[in-house]
UniProtKB/Swiss-Prot annotation:
Family, per entry: Belongs to the PMEI family.
Official protein name in the record: Pectinesterase inhibitor 12
Source organism of this protein record: Oryza sativa subsp. japonica (Rice)
Disulfide partners: 32-47, 100-140
Annotated compartments: Secreted, Extracellular space, Apoplast
Induction comment: Induced by drought stress.
Range of residues in the leader sequence: 1-26
Lineage: Eukaryota, Viridiplantae, Streptophyta, Embryophyta, Tracheophyta
Keyword Signal recorded: yes
Length: 203
């Protein structure tokens, strides 16, 4: 169902007020809003909260910043896994924890690699690295689902956050990629024009 113009205006105002309350720079606000519009999986509030302090960054800088948030989330998850593995009551889930530990090593590396290639403006490669980070993180969820046990906190929240930041980072990287590729810009403009309602040539 298409959002009415009035409702869309209310949503836009709400986002602006929320961003202002957090002290978010206008570039961060617009980039996160564009990312959320381009990929419905993007959680706008998380994008604003995680990237809002990067006041001087353009979209390219925000894409790189998001990958570093991903590295940090992966490191925190790895530390939490070690603590869970050391617990006396986790014998039944230790194989799943071992699988998560293995996957999160790859997650951190994928985010770090994404940062490096995005910094070199190899956006397509960066998008693939972020897909890899997302896939590896989801394998931790799958390891616990296989034994029918939910992830314990705070690992569950860290995993959800890592998945979300991979989605956010890729969405922003895609925006930068499109904006820096004349052919993609032209294709996007043509697609938007094709979707726009046609005005009659008659009064």
């Amino acid at each position: 169902m298409r959002m009415s113009k009035a409702l869309a205006a209310v949503v836009a105002i709400s986002v602006s007020l929320s961003a202002a309350a957090m002290g978010v720079d206008a570039t961060v606000e617009s980039t996160c809003s564009d990312a959320a519009a381009s990929d419905k999986r993007v959680h706008l509030a998380m994008c604003l909260s995680q990237l809002g302090h990067h006041r001087d960054a353009d979209a390219w800088g925000l894409a790189k910043a998001a990958t570093l948030v991903g590295v940090d989330k992966a490191d925190l998850a790895a530390d939490d896994i070690k603590e869970l593995e050391a617990g006396a009551s986790t014998a039944g889930i230790k194989p799943a924890l071992a699988e998560c530990a293995k996957q999160y090593r790859g997650v951190g590396f994928a985010f770090a690699s994404a940062h490096d290639v995005i910094n070199n403006r190899a956006y397509d490669v960066g998008e693939k690295k972020l897909d890899e980070a997302l896939s590896l993180t989801q394998k931790c969820n799958a390891a616990f689902a296989k034994i029918g046990v939910p992830l314990q906190q705070p690992l569950a929240q860290l995993t959800a956050d890592t998945i979300q930041i991979a989605i956010i980072a890729k969405a922003i990287t895609c925006l930068v990629n499109v904006n820096n590729n004349p052919a993609l810009v032209a294709a996007a403009a043509a697609a938007a024009a094709a979707k726009a309602p046609q005005q009659s040539q008659y009064p």
